[in-house]
Amino acid sequence: MTAETKEHATGSELIPKYSPKGAFVAEVAAAGSRLAQFSIEFSGDKPGEIRAVTDILERHKVNILSGSHESARWSFFVDLSQSDASTAQLVQELKALPDIQTVQSQDGLNGVIVDALHHPLMMGKNRAVLFRLDTIGSVFSRPREIFGAEGPLGKVLLHQMGRAGGQSSLKAFSETMGRDRIREQLPNIMNMYAAGGWGIFKLMEVDFDRGVAVVQAFENFECTTHRGKRGEPYSQYVRGDLAGLFSEVFDKKVDAVETQCVVQGAPFCRFEIAPASKGTA
């Protein structure tokens, strides 16, 4: 992450500068566009492998639209509308490269292509799923609609769902990096929220001995669509997630209280984490 900063659009806090990251899912172009997808497995992980592929694409005037690259594999969408080559021809030329092990491809349908070459979606060693913000917003609104916007049942349900998710996430991190590295890697664990599209979460304070922490969340996905529309803090799922995650970090049950929220007009959501009171859910 660079040290470059910018003023956040919804507040005076200076936060690290982030660039949007597109999910490698689909591409849409004008009707009649010749879209295609390639998924190439390299025989090793050597410098220059991708350059050899892009040389072929450049020679045939193939426009790369988007892609996803990981060790020894590169998947990408292309626009062949101005190209002199067919998908099949490109596959043959790519297969002829010395470091290419396999090449998969598919053609789009009248200017639209959706990734049909990869499953499941993975986050590290764990399977992941994607939801659009409007979709998950509708899902999280439903318990409030059923049990009443201000009633406790919907809030408790969302909070407990979040708590379970946070505990599960931290356990997965522990299995990946080792339990003894969790405290050291807490800044990176906070960065996972941004990487997953949840928002920009900043760890402002932490005291491992007392089991307390303060987190600021910019663009909190649970609240951002209700910005400035409500009088009290709105986040239930995210505060539950933080409570579950930090309960695992501190190895004791803690609660997360949202002390300010963007739905109230604040520039960010602020959560205070502290040991749970006896008898709390």
Regions found by a protein language model. Name each.
Residues 19-26, 58-66:
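Short amphipathic beta-strand starts and helix->beta connectors
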Residues 43-65, 91-94:
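Short amphipathic alpha-helix segments
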Residues 65-66, 258-260:
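Beta-strand-rich interaction surfaces with strong enrichment in secreted/lumenal proteins
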